[in-house]
């Protein structure tokens, strides 16, 4: 499948910013099942994008620009060719042993409720993969996708108590439960092509990966109740959202920030343009 991405992020400031520094994790890598045909990042300021790799092997671009800055736009356009690998990740850069991904974070800590939920799925019997699929299926059923009650700093505990959230929250709850069971798990950010023909989206997508004996890393998209397919584009991974956030940074000044995000994910059968 050929998938085209157009992702535009616009920062507007009521009071112009004096300076901005940002790190972007917006560039995919090639690995089995994913080939980047072309990819471009543009920033509408006088700055240079410095490419690096972070500790998790993600491609990053860092830039700084001096003000006054009234608006700042980061735009991504790209084309990626994908094939279905049944959710199994092969050929990705692995800088750490799987055990590192047992490390908890504030966003992925498990409380008594998440621990009990995880133990109930394990008690159903079966191997690690069966337990993870039970967790995937039941989280998809028991939590409701709802963008209103949560935000970027919502923890797994908070989202699970609400039984609501966005893809980031589903991923954090899945990770918290898996780690409680002693299964290494990590957060993945990327894009998802909806099967219903929806191309205009308000943000990118997120899911989890867990390390399974004899298979390695396997993806679990709890928000959609499936393992990643050729409809998924994998961008960055880490212990939680903070390690894989598309854009993170800081600014001096720039009070009254307003953020607008437009994402278009479509098969490369027709021209895609963010209006």
Which stretches of residues belong to each language-model region?
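Secondary-structure boundary elements
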Residues: 80-84, 90, 96-165, 173, ...
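Hydrophobic/aromatic-rich core segments of domains that either
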Residues: 20, 169-255
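Flexible, active-site-adjacent loop/turn segments at secondary-structure boundaries
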Residues: 11, 15, 24, 34, ...
């Amino acid at each position: 499948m050929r998938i085209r991405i157009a992702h535009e992020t616009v920062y507007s400031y009521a009071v112009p910013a004096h300076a901005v520094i940002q790190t972007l994790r917006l560039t995919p890598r090639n690995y089995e099942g994913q080939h980047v045909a072309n990819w471009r990042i543009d920033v509408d300021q006088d700055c240079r994008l410095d490419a690096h790799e972070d500790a998790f092997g993600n491609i990053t671009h860092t830039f700084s620009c001096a003000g006054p800055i009234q608006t700042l736009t980061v735009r991504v356009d790209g084309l990626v060719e994908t094939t279905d690998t049944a959710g199994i990740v092969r050929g990705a850069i692995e800088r750490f042993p799987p055990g590192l991904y047992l490390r908890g974070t504030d966003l992925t800590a498990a409380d008594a409720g998440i621990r009990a939920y995880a133990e109930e799925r394990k008690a159903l019997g079966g191997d690690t993969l069966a337990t993870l699929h039970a967790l995937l299926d039941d989280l998809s059923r028991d939590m409701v996708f709802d963008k209103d009650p949560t935000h970027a700093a919502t923890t797994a505990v908070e989202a699970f108590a609400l039984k609501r959230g966005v893809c980031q929250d589903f991923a954090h709850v899945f990770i918290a439960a898996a780690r409680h069971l002693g299964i290494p798990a990590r957060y993945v950010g990327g894009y998802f092509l909806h099967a219903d023909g929806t191309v205009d989206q308000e943000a990118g997508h997120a899911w989890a990966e867990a390390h399974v004996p004899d298979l390695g890393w396997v993806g679990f998209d709890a928000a959609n109740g499936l393992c990643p397919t050729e409809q998924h584009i994998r961008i960055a991974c880490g212990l939680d959202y903070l390690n894989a956030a598309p854009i993170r940074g800081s600014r001096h000044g720039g009070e009254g920030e307003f953020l607008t995000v437009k994402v278009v994910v479509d098969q490369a059968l027709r021209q895609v343009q963010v209006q």
